């Protein structure tokens, strides 16, 4: 083959590569948010998104931008975050998992990979999100895993917290549990699961909804803790919900106890469903 013919073949292959429809890939992501200024890429501060995109771009050998199921705030963690991206790069699954993990810092990891249909969207295809909030309920603060839970030294009655929270189930106006700076067009959300359980010195508040307004879980937890320690009656949560006034509710619980543990999608996408966690917690 002459040099001219060889060059033409290489050029034709490059053109064909560029004209090929891009692949859409979904990833499951786990991260410890303690050292990051939230999920979203920002200028001059560390973010989970920026670290992930840098690692993916290196493996793909092209710029990669990801879209996520839900943006988490500074200090918030994830065991069940889902993202998607499009790429012209053809790689084995091991490259998108182990290869990307080799280029990520130790506190971010890819848990699974799946090629998805072109109509999949990590955010808009999701039908529900699930969060767990971890409280270390002991007189003395923890030293181990202190950035992965919130310490509360007054004894908490989980039965009171559980009963008080049941009024939040269903579709409601969550203005009383919505951050003032929330940009959502509506405060209405549909909560279909809320459980409060104790595991020794650890308390878990487990909430699932179609979506959440800004700081909704942390604001609910802050008010439930007021009920749990006896500062407020069980009926107070229902009163707050009806009042639609954020200034009447409890303080926002700290970020370090919060985990995005799962995102639900229609069965037709057949996404992997790993254990939610965090740590010792079963599904």
UniProtKB/Swiss-Prot annotation:
Record site: Interaction with tRNA: 71, 91, 123, 139, 152
Record flagged with keyword Signal: no
GO biological process: tRNA pseudouridine synthesis
Pfam families: PseudoU_synth_1 (PF01416)
Top-level taxonomic group: Bacteria
Keyword Protein biosynthesis: no
InterPro entries attached to this UniProt entry: PsdUridine_synth_cat_dom_sf (IPR020103), PsdUridine_synth_TruA (IPR001406), PsdUridine_synth_TruA_a/b_dom (IPR020097), PsdUridine_synth_TruA_C (IPR020095), TruA/RsuA/RluB/E/F_N (IPR020094)
Signal peptide: none
Active site, per annotation: 73 (nucleophile)
Keyword list, A-Z: Isomerase, tRNA processing
A molecular function (GO) term: tRNA pseudouridine(38-40) synthase activity
The enzyme's E.C. designation: 5.4.99.12
Catalytic activity: uridine(38/39/40) in tRNA = pseudouridine(38/39/40) in tRNA
Sequence segments annotated as region (RNA binding): 120-124
Region of interest called Interaction with tRNA, as start-end residue ranges on this chain: 181-185
Binding sites annotated in the UniProt record for substrate: 131
Family classification: Belongs to the tRNA pseudouridine synthase TruA family.
Subunit record text: Homodimer.
Function in brief: Formation of pseudouridine at positions 38, 39 and 40 in the anticodon stem and loop of transfer RNAs.
Official protein name in the record: tRNA pseudouridine synthase A
Gene assigned in the entry: truA
